[in-house]
Amino acid sequence: MTRRTTINPDSVVLNPQKFIQKERADSKIKVDQVNTFLESSPERRTLTHALIDQIVNDPILKTDTDYYDAKKMQEREITAKKIARLASYMEHDIKTVRKHFRDTDLMKELQANDPDKASPLTNKDLFIFDKRLSLVANIDPQLGTRVGVHLGLFGNCIKGNGTDEQIRYWLQERGATLMKGIYGCFAMTELGHGSNVAQLQTRAVYDKQNDTFVIDTPDLTATKWWIGGAAHSATHAAVYARLIVEGKDYGVKTFVVPLRDPSTFQLLAGVSIGDIGAKMGRDGIDNGWIQFRNVVIPREFMLSRFTKVVRSPDGSVTVKTEPQLDQISGYSALLSGRVNMVMDSFRFGSKFATIAVRYAVGRQQFAPRKGLSETQLIDYPLHQYRVLPQLCVPYLVSPVAFKLMDNYYSTLDELYNASSSAYKAALVTVSKKLKNLFIDSASLKATNTWLIATLIDELRQTCGGHGYSQYNGFGKGYDDWVVQCTWEGDNNVLSLTSAKSILKKFIDSATKGRFDNTLDVDSFSYLKPQYIGSVVSGEIKSGLKELGDYTEIWSITLIKLLAHIGTLVEKSRSIDSVSKLLVLVSKFHALRCMLKTYYDKLNSRDSHISDEITKESMWNVYKLFSLYFIDKHSGEFQQFKIFTPDQISKVVQPQLLALLPIVRKDCIGLTDSFELPDAMLNSPIGYFDGDIYHNYFNEVCRNNPVEADGAGKPSYHALLSSMLGRGFEFDQKLGGAANAEILSKINK
């Protein structure tokens, strides 16, 4: 039995709003300038605000706290409605980019018989919609994934591996790019293999007689697993399978395989599909398993930009491949996901940092002595140490996320152009750029998704018991986030892969003087032969006096760490023996990338920050981030003699502790600078007005309504009554009342 509140809602004992309002009034930070910095440019900031405004005011796309109470099937139904809603925005967004608002049918144009008239959709065409999807994913990650699997994985797999004709057919004529006609999934992972793509077991056997491929699942472990959209939604799959021609295995290639009839959604012959069931989070995604039993597809359904099965008039068959790009092209679809996860890290980090900081400012606990007001959480030094470095994380992620995204799109454009070029030099150049992009995206994806997983849980704990409530977002936020640490590349495997490439670059530079001054000059500038020599000789000293030192210290540490690893590998002849250290290389490389990109941007005109007080606050964020992670990794910094124990305790830690109260003074200005409306936060303890307790209580009551008279017993009420009924006999003997005899016993 429950009963409505009888407390006057206007009575106020604790008033967290006054603290938020005071902090906001006292802040000297220019919020508009900082937000422009965080959104990369004034134009992007304007677009972000316009799209957020549309999203939070769309009755279908917006989310409220009832989102946290939804069950699996409810989530999937709601997600399906939202997918349909997003699809309706897509054509509008493309026309906006093209400035093409005349009364024409974009789908009809894309399907035109004459390829010259059917203008292909480019990355630029999808710029606004991609931005919209990224922002939607911040309030509803499962929706972002559902659409992202179709456009980002299925679509980019076709773009990265298909011929121009195949791209046009699947993405334009069949309507995939506009989410019309067909809906795709990405069938790479198997029950028995995930990260080791080269050992996937699904087979695509070429049938020479019928000029077709036969797709087959040879055993249980080859079952496609975790396939988003497969269980109920996808009509087609981009399937990773072993190409077998005349008995020879050519390795894993990509094929488009129909799964369902798009008009009836009936499974096609030979295709078996099931739902993989309950997951830790993102239940709005219908992840499924797929098995193929002799499924026949035309030869043309093999994506053939870099590997072709060619049938000659005389009946002979040859396999032609472009070795420069064939191997890495197979992973190109995953690049978009990894790049987007770095951007997601900025968006998610800013969301949860905002909630936790506002709560820490408004919440009071314990008075220093009797008669004084209770202290705000944010004024406790330990709380500052727990919260403020986490606030710095999304600040440092933002510049590198936008830079990585821009690099990704420009490199992909070069890839498409190079694969159509007769000039081998173009292929060589874009191949090197892709490899560097793989290193950076792998390192940054792994490191940042780990950082945000830590951020969400640590900040949840700083909000105490209220952080544990689903209505404040941390629980579902964490469950939805941590899949990022294992999908589209397990973080440890990605870290090892990127670090091995960095180690090779280091050895080539240190021992052979090899360094590409064109392609490696940015992310890998610390690997220049001259710089390595200066660090090894001791000419370059570590210190924390100038702003640039907070980045360079990571360059010095990386070189000493890589040199140490090189020595160990030379002795053991086993790269696996240094795996733990290689993961550190990847993390340190990512942290250096983040610091360097932030430093370069804040030092440039492109920072868009003209106010000196604001810029000083931004530099404090930069220094606090670097110092926090130096302190976290102080063991390594001492091991490689970057700092002595005395320097850690007398230089690094005092600087770190001194910065906390300085950044604390700006914390509301820094969180306001993310410019996230309440509807994007969806957490009543973090809303802009700071009315923590009323906002939270009202949302709890709205989602758990109570009858005025307290009527309505739970279904298990009889069980509780029966359990307690075991004591009724004694109660009845005493007349069922608290008589004088009982009270006298209690009071003895």
Curated annotation (Swiss-Prot):
Keywords: FAD, Fatty acid metabolism, Flavoprotein, Lipid metabolism, Oxidoreductase, Peroxisome. GO terms for cellular component: peroxisomal matrix; peroxisome. One of its GO terms (biological process) is fatty acid beta-oxidation. Pfam families: ACOX, ACOX_C_alpha1, Acyl-CoA_dh_M, Acyl-CoA_ox_N. Homooctamer. It is found in: Peroxisome. Its EC number is 1.3.3.6. One of its GO terms (molecular function) is fatty acid binding. Its main location: other. Gene3D superfamilies: Acyl-CoA dehydrogenase/oxidase, N-terminal domain (1.10.540.10), Butyryl-CoA Dehydrogenase, subunit A, domain 2 (2.40.110.10), Butyryl-CoA Dehydrogenase, subunit A, domain 3 (1.20.140.10). This is Acyl-coenzyme A oxidase. It comes from Saccharomyces cerevisiae (strain ATCC 204508 / S288c). InterPro entries: ACO, ACOX_C_alpha1, Acyl-CoA_ox_N, Acyl-CoA_Oxase/DH_mid-dom, Acyl-CoA_Oxase/DH_mid-dom_sf, Acyl-CoA_oxidase, Acyl-CoA_oxidase_C, AcylCo_DH-like_C. Belongs to the acyl-CoA oxidase family. It catalyses: a 2,3-saturated acyl-CoA + O2 = a (2E)-enoyl-CoA + H2O2.
